[in-house]
């Protein structure tokens, strides 16, 4: 696949992830869009294949961190925050046992 297509794919992945991660938060959506666009514009004239591949890898890593690590919270009172996790971040709850298992 051409380098140009790889760059475009990472750009689109970042934009889609931004829309999912910061859903219903207009300020964060706009800030993320501006930052993504700024970084891609800043490196628009890069010609070194090695540097481009490194930046593609960095963009993919950033997208993964956003998708897997960022949680939305909103202020609902003076000292209260409402956590709004996405379904992809929820893990299966495994019961905790205080006693060690008996060997059979």
Swiss-Prot record:
Instruction: Tell me which UniProt keywords the record has, alphabetically.
Output: Chaperone, Mitochondrion
Q: What is its main location?
A: mitochondrion
- Gene Ontology terms, cellular component aspect? mitochondrial matrix
Give the matching CDD domains: Complex1_LYR_LYRM7
Output the superkingdom of the source species.
Answer: Eukaryota
Q: Where in the cell is it found?
A: Mitochondrion matrix
Q: What's an example GO BP annotation here?
A: mitochondrial respiratory chain complex III assembly
GO MF terms listed in the record are: protein folding chaperone
Q: Which InterPro entries match?
A: Complex1_LYR_dom, Complex1_LYR_LYRM7, MZM1/LYRM7
Cite the record's note on assembly.
Answer: Interacts with UQCRFS1.
Q: What does this protein do?
A: Assembly factor required for Rieske Fe-S protein UQCRFS1 incorporation into the cytochrome b-c1 (CIII) complex. Functions as a chaperone, binding to this subunit within the mitochondrial matrix and stabilizing it prior to its translocation and insertion into the late CIII dimeric intermediate within the mitochondrial inner membrane.
Matching PANTHER family, A to Z? COMPLEX III ASSEMBLY FACTOR LYRM7 (PTHR46749:SF1)
Similarity comment: Belongs to the complex I LYR family.
Q: What is this protein called?
A: Complex III assembly factor LYRM7
- Its source organism is Tetraodon nigroviridis (Spotted green pufferfish)
Gene transcribed to yield this protein: lyrm7
């Amino acid at each position: 696949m051409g380098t140009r297509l790889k760059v475009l794919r990472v750009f689109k992945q970042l934009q889609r992830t931004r829309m999912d991660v910061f859903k219903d938060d207009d300020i964060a959506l706009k800030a993320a869009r501006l930052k993504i666009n700024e970084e891609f514009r800043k490196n628009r004239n890069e010609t070194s294949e090695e540097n481009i591949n490194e930046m593609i890898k960095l963009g993919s890593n950033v997208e993964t961190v956003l998708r897997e690590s960022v949680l939305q919270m909103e202020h609902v009172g003076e000292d209260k925050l409402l956590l709004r996790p996405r379904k992809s971040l929820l893990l299966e709850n495994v019961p905790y046992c205080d006693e060690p298992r008996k060997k059979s």
